[in-house]
A protein has these predicted regions:
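Conserved phosphate/anionic-ligand binding catalytic regions in large, soluble enzymes, centered on
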Residues: 50-56
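ATP-dependent carboxylate-amine ligase
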Residues: 37, 43-48, 60-70, 74-236
Length: 236
C-alpha cells in the first residue's frame, strides 16, 4: 500500500489492489471495496503469503474483466485448493491428526514460498519428501535443500521417475550436498521410488506433525496420498 509506485498510482485516482492489514482492498479514486482475508479460505486468514498474492491477482483480473463484486466475493469464499481444483498446488490433507501438504514446487523460489507458508501453520515435528528436476542447474538443485534444511527436522530424498538427462543418483547427490551443515535437519534418508518415499514419511507421522510432500508424478501421487488418508480415516 505504501510503496512509492502504488502510492503515486492511487493518488492519481487509478485502479489499485493492495493489502491493508487483514484485508485485500480494491481502490479507484475515493471508492473502496474491502475483502476480509478471513473470508477467503485458501489464505488461512491471511497466513499463507503466496495465496494472498494469488488472491490479489485474481481480484485485479476479475475487476478488470468487469465481473460484479458479488460474483468475485462468492468465487473467493467458495474456492478450495484441493487436489481436484488445483492439483499439486498446496493441497492440504489430514493423516491421523497430522497435516500433509502436497505441492509440485521444483525451484528455489517455490521452496522459499512453501517454507514461509509452512512456518505459518502449526506442526510439531516437520518432515519433507523431495526429489529434484534433473534439467535444472546444479546450484538450483542444491539451493532447494539449503532452504529446506533450515525449516524441516527430517528430509526424505527420492529419485524422480524421469531424471531428465541426469545419471543415476546424480540429483539425489546434489540434494544431499545442499543439506550439508543444515541448521535444522537432523535426519536425511535416500529412497528409490516416489510412493515408497511418501509411505515412509506417512508411517512416521504422529498427531500434530506436519509433512510437506513435493510430488513428481502429480496425479498418481495425489491419488496415492488421498487413498492413504482415506484408509487412515476409516481405521481411526
Amino acid at each position: 500500500r505504501h510503496h512509492p509506485v502504488m502510492a503515486t498510482h492511487r493518488a492519481q485516482g487509478h485502479r489499485t489492489v493492495y493489502v491493508d492489514g487483514d484485508s485485500v482492498v480494491a481502490a479507484e479514486g475515493s471508492w473502496r471495496e474491502t475483502i476480509h482475508l478471513r473470508d477467503v479460505p485458501i489464505t488461512r486468514n491471511g497466513k499463507i503469503g503466496f495465496q494472498v498474492e494469488n488472491v490479489m491477482a485474481s481480484v485485479a483480473a476479475a475487476w478488470g474483466a468487469g465481473l460484479p463484486w458479488q460474483t468475485i466475493r462468492r468465487g473467493l469464499s467458495g474456492f478450495v485448493n484441493d487436489s481436484d481444483n488445483a492439483p499439486g498446488r498446496f493441497n492440504l490433507m489430514d493423516f491421523k491428526g497430522a497435516t500433509v501438504i502436497a505441492d509440485y514446487g521444483h525451484n528455489p523460489d517455490a521452496m522459499r514460498a512453501l517454507v514461509a507458508a509452512v512456518d505459518a501453520l502449526p506442526g510439531n515435528r516437520r518432515s519433507v519428501v523431495i526429489s529434484g528436476a534433473g534439467d535444472r542447474r546444479d546450484e538450483d538443485i542444491r539451493e532447494q535443500t539449503v532452504i529446506l534444511g533450515a525449516a524441516f527436522d527430517d528430509v526424505i530424498l527420492y529419485q524422480d521417475a524421469a531424471q531428465r538427462g541426469r545419471g543415476d543418483g546424480e540429483v539425489m547427490a546434489l540434494l544431499r550436498e545442499g543439506l550439508a551443515g543444515a541448521a535444522r535437519t537432523r535426519h536425511v534418508e535416500e529412497i528409490r521410488g516416489e510412493f515408497i518415499a511418501i509411505d515412509t514419511a506417512l508411517d512416521r507421522l504422529q498427531p500434530g506433525d506436519l509433512c510437506l510432500v513435493l510430488v513428481d508424478q502429480v496425479e498418481e501421487a495425489l491419488a496415492h496420498l488421498a487413498r492413504r488418508c482415506a484408509e487412515a480415516g476409516v481405521a481411526a
